[in-house]
Every structure is written in structure tokens, then in C-alpha cells.
């Protein structure tokens, strides 16, 4: 990570958060062949809306998602479907240039070198991607069992809690920390004490 500088910004509202992070993404997209890591969930929705509204050039950009359920990628609740709906189908990124964690995880690790910008969200129990509290800081991309709290939190995206996948493939904390720049987005009072 460049310079290891920790900067905390408290913003007025959720939409300002999306705009501020969109500024960082827009700057990153000016690099010759930018590589980004992107999150899912409710927190980055304002970011994705703002990025679509800015009509930026994504044609040389490669993206990697932090995680994906162990689920058919075309399932309506997969993160692949989420990202297509929120961003990829609405900007000029080539389908061959966006990637989700896959098995074998070692092959995915080989693809994700030299990340320019990694955007993260944080779960209500402090998980980053699907790295639950207590995950090793050296962890790599791997298949994980989801905690009961994470399954419960994510049930809002499914018709019932029984439909929430019990496993996911996630980038590890060690993998994430190799990014040149990291931005952690957090929104809401429930994230204040994490």
C-alpha cells in the first residue's frame, strides 16, 4: 500500500460518500490500464450511481470483485448479477475485463497483481469482503463458510434466510493489503462502533 497513510473523513451524508469515492475512482481511471477491486452490498450503491452518471471511460479498466457466493453466477442474487445491474451493464467496460473470485483460487490470485485501487465496505460485525473477524491478516483468496450474522444480514437480499448461500469465495486480507490504495466505505450509525 502506498505510503501507509490512514486518512479518515466523516462526510455529511450517504450521497456525499458516493461522490467522494467516485472522485477517487475517476482519478484512477486516468491511469493507462487501471485495475480496481470493487465491493457489493448496499454501501457502494451511491458510488455506482454516481459513476454511471459521470459517463467515464472504462474501456481500458480491469476490475475484480472482492467476493462471490458459491452460487451460479447467473443467479439473480449473485454478486455477478448485482454488479452487472448496478455498474457493468451501464458503463463501457468489456465483459472480459471484469472478474469475480473463482476456483481454483490460486488462479484468481495470479490475475490480481498490481491493483491500483481497492474499494471496501464493512459488515455489521466488522467483516471485510467475507473475511470474518479473526481472519488472518496474511489470508489469500479462498472459500469460506459464512457466519450466522453475515447470513442473517444478507438475508435482506433474498426471499428468505434459507436461500442465502452458506459459503463464498473471498479475497483474503493479505491479498487486499497488496493494493496500492485502499478506500473503506462505511455508512450508518450501526457502523460507528466497529
Go through the PLM ranges and name each one.
Residues 48, 59-67, 71-74, 128-132, ...:
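Active-site histidine-anchored catalytic micro-motif
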Residues 2-5, 58-119:
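Ligand-binding beta-strand-loop-alpha-helix segment within the catalytic cores
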Residues 1-36:
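N-terminal glycine-/serine-/threonine-rich phosphate-binding loop
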Residues 38-43, 120-124, 187:
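Glycine-rich beta-strand-to-loop/alpha-helix junction loops that act as flexible
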Residues 129-173:
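Class I SAM-dependent methyltransferase SAM-binding "motif I" and its flanking Rossmann-like core
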Residues 174, 178-194:
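ATP/nucleoside-binding phosphotransfer catalytic cores, i.e., glycine-rich phosphate-binding loops
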Residues 113-138:
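Glycine-rich phosphate-binding loop
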Residues 25, 31-54:
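Glycine-rich N-terminal segment of FAD-binding domains in flavoprotein oxidoreductases
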Amino acid at each position: 500500500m502506498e505510503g501507509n497513510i490512514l486518512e479518515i473523513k466523516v462526510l455529511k451524508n450517504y450521497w456525499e460518500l458516493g461522490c467522494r469515492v467516485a472522485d477517487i475512482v475517476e482519478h484512477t481511471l486516468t491511469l493507462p490500464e487501471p485495475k480496481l477491486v470493487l465491493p457489493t452490498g448496499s454501501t457502494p450503491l451511491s458510488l455506482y450511481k454516481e459513476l454511471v452518471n459521470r459517463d467515464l471511460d472504462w474501456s481500458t479498466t480491469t476490475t475484480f470483485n472482492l467476493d462471490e457466493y458459491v452460487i451460479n453466477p447467473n443467479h439473480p442474487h449473485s454478486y455477478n448479477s448485482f454488479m452487472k445491474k448496478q455498474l457493468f451493464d451501464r458503463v463501457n467496460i468489456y465483459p472480459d475485463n471484469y472478474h469475480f473470485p473463482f476456483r481454483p483460487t490460486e488462479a484468481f490470485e495470479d490475475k490480481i497483481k498490481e491493483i491500483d485501487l481497492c474499494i471496501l465496505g464493512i459488515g455489521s460485525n466488522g467483516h471485510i469482503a467475507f473475511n470474518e473477524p479473526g481472519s488472518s491478516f496474511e489470508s489469500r483468496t479462498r472459500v469460506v463458510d459464512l457466519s450466522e450474522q453475515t447470513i442473517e444480514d444478507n438475508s435482506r437480499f433474498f426471499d428468505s434466510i434459507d436461500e442465502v448461500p452458506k459459503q463464498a469465495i473471498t479475497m483474503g486480507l493479505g491479498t487486499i493489503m497488496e493494493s496500492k490504495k485502499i478506500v473503506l466505505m462505511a455508512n450508518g450509525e450501526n457502523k460507528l462502533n466497529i
